[in-house]
Every structure is written in structure tokens, then in C-alpha cells.
Regions:
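Conserved strand-turn element in the central/C-terminal portion of the radical SAM core barrel
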Residues: 33-36, 49-79
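Generic structural signal for hydrophobic
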Residues: 14-15, 52, 83, 135
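Glycine-enriched alpha-helix->loop->beta-strand junction motifs that scaffold or abut catalytic
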Residues: 16-22
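Short, small-residue-biased leader/transition segments that mark boundaries at the very start
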Residues: 1-5
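Auxiliary Fe-S-binding modules of radical SAM enzymes
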Residues: 67-146
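Conserved radical SAM core fold
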Residues: 6-9, 22-40, 65-68, 100-102
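Hydrophobic faces of well-ordered beta-strands that scaffold small-molecule active sites
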Residues: 22-24, 59-61, 91-97
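Distinct, well-ordered alpha-helical segments
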Residues: 8-16
Length: 146
């Protein structure tokens, strides 16, 4: 079952009762940035990630890395601090460098791929490796892709 981690706590609890592992996207620790790019703030998302960790439930964190949006030292450090503070760490953190593979799919469906026209770029290999290093410095397991 697919659900959004910004659903109600009851929904999150129900999903945990019926699944073995959660894959959770964490796009930005800055609620304003999250609101700008995702149209919703991140407080409920962070609260539900904490809820999953406190339930001692296995989960992966997926962080899409977008140059100029969230692939920077400040956001990754804040993400690492938050995740390292939880009673159960994610099994792994998958850093997902931005790509535009979905552009063709959106065109076929008649939808707009980037409706707000943001400049979306893949971070350099160097930036990706710096992000991995920050996360591992906090005792977290991280990889590119996943």
C-alpha cells in the first residue's frame, strides 16, 4: 500500500500494522523550502518519521538531491542531526540525485513536469559524496541511489 507520510497518525499506525518496511521521502528540513517545492510544510512529515522511529519500526529514508534546493551542507546536516536523534535510525538513507526521466511520462499523460518552472539540476559527484560523508559522520548508513 502506498501512503503519504504526511497522513494522519492513525493512517501511519495502520500502515505499520500491515507492512514490514516503510520507504519515506525527506525532501527538506526547512519547512519554507518544503512548502515552496512540495506545496505543504514539513512538520507533520517530521512528526510521523519520529513516530515510526519511536515505534521501533524499520524504515528507509530517501532524500532526493536537487542542486540549489536541498543538496547543500546546511540541509544535509539538519537532516543528519534529526535522523541521528531518533531512537531508531533508518536502515539506510538513499540519496537520490535529481534526474528528469519522468519528463516523457508527464508529456504522454498530458501533465506538466515542472509546473512552477524551477531550475532543477543534478548535484555534482563531489556534492553527492559530501552529502554521504555528512550523514556517515553522524553514524548513519547512506548510499547514492536505491
Amino acid at each position: 500500500r502506498q501512503m503519504c507520510i504526511r497522513d494522519s497518525k492513525e493512517t501511519v499506525d495502520e500502515v505499520m500494522r500491515n507492512c514490514e518496511l516503510l520507504l519515506i521521502d525527506l525532501k527538506s528540513m526547512d519547512s519554507t523550502v518544503h512548502q515552496t517545492f512540495c506545496d505543504v510544510p514539513n512538520e507533520l512529515i517530521l512528526e510521523n518519521i519520529r513516530r515510526v522511529a519511536e515505534a521501533d519500526f524499520p524504515y528507509y529514508i530517501r532524500i532526493p538531491l536537487i542542486e540549489g534546493v536541498n543538496a547543500d551542507e546546511k540541509n544535509i546536516k539538519l537532516s543528519a542531526e534529526f535522523l541521528a536523534s531518533l531512537p531508531r535510525h533508518p536502515e539506510i538513507i538513499n540519496l537520490l540525485p535529481y534526474h528528469d526521466i519522468g519528463k516523457g511520462k508527464h508529456a504522454k499523460l498530458g501533465s506538466i513536469y515542472n509546473p512552477k518552472g524551477y531550475k532543477m539540476q543534478t548535484p555534482s559527484e563531489e556534492v553527492q559524496q559530501q552529502c554521504i560523508q555528512i550523514l556517515t559522520d553522524y553514524g548513519l548508513k547512506a548510499t547514492i541511489g536505491g
